[in-house]
A protein has these predicted regions:
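Short, charged/polar low-complexity linear motifs in solvent-exposed/disordered segments
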Residues: 42, 100, 122-124
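Catalytic core of DAGKc-family lipid kinases
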Residues: 105-169
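A generic structural signal for short, solvent-exposed coil/turn residues
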Residues: 6-8, 35-37, 87, 97, ...
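Fold-independent oxyanion-binding glycine-rich loops
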Residues: 18-20, 46-48, 75-78, 98-100, ...
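Short, acidic/small-residue loops that bind anionic groups at enzyme active sites
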Residues: 91-109
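N-terminal glycine-/serine-/threonine-rich phosphate-binding loop
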Residues: 2-75, 79-89
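Exposed boundary/loop context
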Residues: 69-72, 90, 94-97, 117
Length: 169
């Protein structure tokens, strides 16, 4: 999201989302919130993230309240970004990924460049990328010939259909 310097709307409010409930990520969330606050951004924690990390000094908000914010910041790895994209797509709020995972192919900001990247984004120097999502539906034949829907989900870049235990990277 920070690659090219296209003047966009400056960021005044942001919510931090993470599904990685580990102590180093908790410190990163506090650090990101502190840096954003110093840059004049009102920072919130997504309600589930707030419960998972127990950071009472940052106000928590619900998913519905996120709709009115300027930015969603996902702290974690590629899996966190993919999960957030899938569950928050209907909010129509830009998502910025900050890498705290292993690969970081889908995250926009590396922790080593955090200060400079946040300054640029807050000032409005970022570009937006629309990503295609796949609506995946699985159905099975039924006696009346009409397929019975047994599963449905959105996917950002791929979907896997398997019958058994799935291997993870």
């Amino acid at each position: 999201m920070v690659a090219s310097m296209v003047q966009q709307k400056p960021i005044k409010s942001a919510v931090i989302v993470s599904k990685v409930y580990k102590r180093p990520v908790s410190g990163a969330i506090r650090d990101i919130a502190s840096k954003l606050t110093k840059l004049g951004v009102k920072v919130y924690l997504e309600a589930n993230t707030s419960v998972g990390f127990n950071i009472p000094e940052i106000e928590s908000i619900t998913r519905r309240q996120m709709r009115d914010l300027d930015l969603i910041i996902v702290v974690g790895g590629d899996g966190s970004v993919l999960g957030a994209a899938r569950t928050l797509v209907d909010l129509k709020v830009p998502v910025l990924g900050i890498n705290r995972g292993h690969l970081g192919l889908l995250t926009d900001v590396n922790p080593d460049n955090l200060d400079e990247s946040l300054k640029k984004v807050v000032k409005g120097y970022y570009s937006l990328e629309d990503r295609t999502m796949i609506d995946v539906r699985v159905s099975r034949d039924s006696e009346d010939g009409v397929g019975e829907l047994i599963g449905q989900s959105l996917a950002t870049n791929e979907t896997v259909i398997h019958s058994g235990t799935m291997a993870h990277m």
